[in-house]
Amino acid sequence: MELETIEYNKSFNICENGDSKGVQLTFKNISYKVENKNYNKNKKEKNKNKIDPEFVNLDNKTENSNEKEITILYNVGGVIEKGELVALMGPSGSGKSTLLDILAQRKSTGKITGQLLVNGKEIGEAYKKYCSYVTQEDVLLQTYTVFETLKFYADLKLPGVSEIEKIKRVEKVIEDVGLTLKRDSRVGGVLAGGVAVTGLSGGEKRRVSIGCGLITNPSLIFLDEPTSGLDSVAALQIMKTLLNLTLKGVTVICSIHQPRPEIFQLINKVMVIIKGKMIYSGSNILEYFESLGYPCPNNTNPADFCLDSAVEIGEGERYTEICNQWENKWENQLTNEIEYPSLNVDIPKTTSWVYQYWILLNREWRGFIRNKGNALSRVITAIVIGALFGSCFAGLKESDADVQKIMGTLFFLTTGLMLSPFSMITLFLSGRQLFNSERASKIYHSFPYFLSMITVELTIEFFVTLVEVTVCYMLARLRMDAGRFFFAVLVYSFIHSLSTFFISSLANLTGTSDLTFSYASSLSVVFMLFAGFYVPTNELPRAFGWLHWVNPAFYGYSSVVINQFEDLQLKCTDEPCKFTNGNQVIEYYGIEDWTRGGSFGVLVAWATFFYSLSYFALHFLHREKR
């Protein structure tokens, strides 16, 4: 067979004529096993009750099996040619999504055996470079437009490509997925906090997800249930879009449940899996089922008929016989398969962390600015809280009579800034799904992502803190000389940031808002109780005296107290005078052994600790498991 000569642009693995260079994908004897988590439990029950294990159906193991491992796929094989639209079909739990994940090299758990060949050769590191995977859920940034979303992927997945070429590629993909009229429309959805952004329909979002996978012009694209959750019209549009891609040489492989007749007619090849075994792969499935004694009645959806017949075969006595017959037939067909030349292109390098950080930082800032409700509410809240604190303690004097009020002002300002990041719990967790999806696609590293998110958050928090502290300090008439005021702003900014890292680390460790709020609120009560305001540190019971040493709030609070009272002369309003100068106040509260710089240094160390904990929890925990 004579192949068309297509010149490659090696810089980012697309053909000069805009079409993808096709490949042949062959998989042989693919088996997949997972650990049976109930094995030990079943073993104990077996020994206890003396149950005969012969009742177990070894062809359809479940979690109640007495085997150490559960086999999900059994020696599955097949050939997928260039430019085919292939549908993996089967009832729920048959193994079609598992096979799709294995072919896309996205399976991160279990034990996989068998061979996966591209153009007759074992796959290597380059395999994922010319494959794309589209998940069942459309995980997209709600405030970005269609163009911005695809441009984001182009920036991170096409290293070494000029800006002009990236834009051309994005415009081409937008045209390919039929979203030219929606180019500048926002994706839309519900933001953290419940704010709804008007945007695309479900079918249009699915096409954006497909477009993200097409940015690198892949030779293979895998889709998990691309029509799931869509109405019949949107589902048909999606499948027509995929069919158009196959005409350009892209091989499309998708799992699909029960397509309507119009969709079924678009499919080039159907692979049917029942109970982990392949019973058919080809383009004449109705004829094959008829040869097995299952003719398709008139006026019946062929897809429904095929699925019903497959289920009946799986539950019948001929299941093993039919599976073995198909396996032998497929092995004979394999000897006559067409050999394509191997794909021999340079593997594009990934973008640098610095570049990833810059692109992600740009996206974070746009996301914040476009979420106007969140931005405005945070500024207004800072002004209101600062005004409330300042008004309650307005016009304080540098006298011994107002020492307690000054201490209260400093304490409640500290605790207010520590508690304000609680509102960010949903924000941290809402971005987690998007991060996991993008990380699984390997478009950026977790460190640039985390750093960009924290950079934006800290910048916003510094501004909010500056507003709140300025309003409060001016109304309460606390020390406003430049050095001490800006040091107070710096300390309060780190208190705010430390609390953000603390909440972020708990959110990344627990993965749920309920647990995060429960742990954070409990620990915050402990932090406030032993911060040194309610009970001076030198008056704490011995059993609890050590707690203030491991309390970040203590170091932040002591810093601003020392900053306020150090070398301050106090006026005596009544006799006897309890405090004549601020140093006596510092001594009374048991922090005379600390300096404002020393306390601030420990506060910075705590902030660094929670920053590191938050990052490592994000990087190593709650990864996408397939």
UniProtKB/Swiss-Prot annotation:
What InterPro entries does the entry give? AAA+_ATPase (IPR003593), ABC2_TM (IPR013525), ABC_transporter-like_ATP-bd (IPR003439), ABC_transporter-like_CS (IPR017871), ABCG_transporters (IPR050352), P-loop_NTPase (IPR027417)
Do the record's keywords include Kinase? no
Instruction: Spell out where the chain crosses the membrane.
Output: 376-396, 409-429, 447-467, 485-505, 515-535, 543-563, 600-620
Q: Which UniProt keywords apply?
A: ATP-binding, Membrane, Nucleotide-binding, Transmembrane, Transmembrane helix, Transport
Question: What GO CC annotations are associated with the protein?
Answer: membrane
User: Which residues of the sequence carry a binding annotation for ATP?
Assistant: 90-97
Query: Residues in domain ABC transporter?
Result: 56-300
What superkingdom heads the lineage?
Eukaryota
One record GO biological process: sorocarp development
How does the entry describe its membrane topology? Answer: Multi-pass membrane protein
Name this protein carries in UniProt:
ABC transporter G family member 8
Q: Which organism is it from?
A: Dictyostelium discoideum
By which gene is this protein encoded? abcG8
